[in-house]
Amino acid sequence: RHVVVNTINPEKPILANKKFRQALYYGVDRENLASLTKQDPAEYIVPTTHMMDLNKNITFRDTEEGKANRKENYGYDPEKAKQLFDEAMSEEGLDKLTLTMHYSDTELMAQMSEFLQQSWPKLFGADRFELKLQAMPANQLSQVKRGWQTNPASYELSWGGWVGNDLAPWNAFKYWTSFYSNKNEPFINEEFDKVFNAANFADDRFDEGV
């Protein structure tokens, strides 16, 4: 699972601030969160099961690129998070911020959302940051998240999680391309599209690995 941020929400322009999004990232204690929900902590998107070379039984996480993409303490860095939060708030001219996180009404997602509701204000300061929660059925939540294309203010924060093909890990990144029709978040990047297309359709895509 990862936190989904609606960066084009006109009512909360700070969501488009890179430093603020980094503050949220570095402000998540993934080890304690995973322990609470009986899951494995991860600060990365590509899971440990995705293969890069079947002949050698090498997963992406086994490669030098996969290892180089890891962060100490699963990315949790409270001091860095607080610094980035303060800088973002100053840049946006804000003294206090209230955000709402939408989540599906299951026990697991409630636990995860409540964890952030408690930990982020404790880290950033309860007098400066508040996280409200809004539970709803999964189908309704999907509609809300995908509604950003016609209603930019459809949501602020939510959760996302995609299933990929272990034998073609690169294909899972289609969810973040500009042309994927069921995008949950307004991430659009021309360079990302080019890399995705090269990995999936270029003539030399099988020169290394699988």
Task: Report each predicted region and the residues it spans.
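Structural transition elements
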Residues: P41-E87, T106-A110, R205-G209
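Short helices/loops that flank or line small-molecule/ion binding pockets
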Residues: E114-G125, N139-Y155
